[in-house]
Amino acid sequence: MATTASNHYNILTSSPSIVHSEPGSMQQATAYRDAQTLLQSDYSLQSNSHPLSHAHQWITALSHGEGGPWSSSPLGEQDIKPAVQSPRDEMHNSSNLQHQSRPPHLVHQTHGNHHDSRAWRTTTAAHIPSMATSNGQSLIYSQPSFSVNGLIPGSGQGIHHHSMRDAHEDHHSPHLSDHGHPPSQHQHQSHQSHHDHSDEDTPTSDDLEQFAKQFKQRRIKLGFTQADVGLALGTLYGNVFSQTTICRFEALQLSFKNMCKLKPLLNKWLEEADSTSGSPTSLDKIAAQGRKRKKRTSIEVSVKGALESHFLKCPKPAASEITSLADSLQLEKEVVRVWFCNRRQKEKRMTPPGGPLPGTEDVYGDTPPHHGVQTPVQ
């Protein structure tokens, strides 16, 4: 078998030309087709009734790790080198092959004339056990037609691309299988669990309504005001809430988002208040933690009449007048000042927007004479 292959190999290498290429031509040489015709005619049918070439069996044997009969023969390598390294000598004799007949079933379609005219194709490369370019990758590959195409000497442009892609995918497939899909499943499961957990923690409107009702009942039973709760929250948790906020929470007048935020704080305050409700000073301690408000001042009727008479004379007294009036009425200076401020605000509320009430100009005594009643223009 090796002898027969060697004879055909010598016939192929003794062919006057292997490659035919002209700069302005869109067709390739016929030497490759003639050589292929020779191989197909000699090895037309095998035992499995497929017209497979003998070269394909050698390539298949090499791809499965079987040693080729020429792998250890230095003579074969010496015979191969002239065919690979001297394409120019073979191209000069291409004019003799132009008039040869071309079988219609072996017409080769080119992809364009953008390839170098030095590109060569030969089936003798199918018998080569291994050929490596400068980057050390094999140039032998098989296609459905069991031929070798696109081999350019001294460069790696003819390397089979999908074999490199397969090697690249095989190299990266463990990485993708180990670090690609399982983390995405883990992230998806963690995200799903977090989403379920957040749905369980979010109360419904019915839960908020029931909690607000229970909170108000327990707060009143413990003796705390809404202001006390707001101040206690500021002392315990750092967030001071006004009495209006607690009132709106109990009346379900806050937004759903704010109700959800305030509910756990009020729940903790209830637990804290229940744990300290046994001591007699628990209410005083929580109340003392808040703001200190001044005691409301109550003024007697006689003192209030004296202030009213002074207000009619001078609604905005000076600081010296406020001091003397406070001493005469035995009141604090701040109390007298605040009373006059409140009285002026009350007067503004009582005065209509169109102007002062009739007769108030004479009372205050600061209205100019020409601002009296105007006569209509005739």
Curated annotation (Swiss-Prot):
Question: SUPFAM superfamilies, from UniProt?
Answer: Homeodomain-like (SSF46689), lambda repressor-like DNA-binding domains (SSF47413)
GO cellular component entries: nucleus
Q: Where is the POU-specific domain?
A: 200-274
Assign the protein's first listed, main location to one coarse class. Answer: nucleus
Listed PROSITE patterns: HOMEOBOX_1, HOMEOBOX_2, POU_1, POU_2, POU_3
Region Disordered, as annotated, extends over 1-28, 86-118, 151-205, 347-378
User: What's the superkingdom here?
Assistant: Eukaryota
Tissue-specificity statement:
Predominantly expressed in the central nervous system, with strong expression in the cerebellum.
Q: What is this protein called?
A: POU domain, class 3, transcription factor 2
Q: Which organism is it from?
A: Danio rerio
